[in-house]
Amino acid sequence: MIVIVDYGLGNISNVKRAIEHLGYEVVVSNKQNIIDQAETIILPGVGHFKDAMSEIKRLNLDAILAKNTDKKMIGICLGMQLMYEHSDEGDASGLGFIPGNISRIQTEYPVPHLGWNNLVSKHPMLNQDVYFVHSYQAPMSENVIAYAQYGTDIPAIVQFNNYIGIQFHPEKSGTYGLQILRQAIQGGFIND
């Protein structure tokens, strides 16, 4: 079972619809007894990092997610950023599952990074356009599987142990985005 974590700031209905379209059983919840049953946990998100972490803590989801670190967790957009240690957006601590700091995009191009952009990767399936909406980015590191070029290199997919972060919106990136979401659910992008 896949559980989409509901903390009140997310693109939940679109993500749920996309996962159902792929044929998976999916439940939306913020309850420990449901999250504990998940094989895969999806952390969606749209909005401000500090506000999201405040809600996650208010709902005790930080502790619940910390008890489920043996499971695959996929963060989408803000959800990816929340898995990091810290963000400059609101100077807030994250969940700390992936090492690094989230920082504002530094580019001569307009911010937010909004619209379609091509993925760059050594992975054979990660080479098409996907849909981005964000103003902050993860650091470039050995955990980056694919990135986009937007006046600077912006991590688009990261994988660290059983944590997968997807900065763009796979649920808004057409058939190709669904293929990426399926690959993330099935095991990720390392050692393919």
Curated annotation (Swiss-Prot):
Pathway(s) annotated for this protein in UniProt: Amino-acid biosynthesis; L-histidine biosynthesis; L-histidine from 5-phospho-alpha-D-ribose 1-diphosphate: step 5/9
EC id: 4.3.2.10, 3.5.1.2
Protein name from the UniProt record: Imidazole glycerol phosphate synthase subunit HisH
UniProt-listed PANTHER family: IMIDAZOLE GLYCEROL PHOSPHATE SYNTHASE SUBUNIT HISH (PTHR42701:SF1)
Protein's organism: Staphylococcus aureus (strain bovine RF122 / ET3-1)
Gene behind the chain: hisH
UniProt-listed SUPFAM superfamilies: Class I glutamine amidotransferase-like
Annotated keywords: Amino-acid biosynthesis, Cytoplasm, Glutamine amidotransferase, Histidine biosynthesis, Hydrolase, Lyase
GO molecular function: glutaminase activity; imidazoleglycerol-phosphate synthase activity; lyase activity
Domain of life: Bacteria
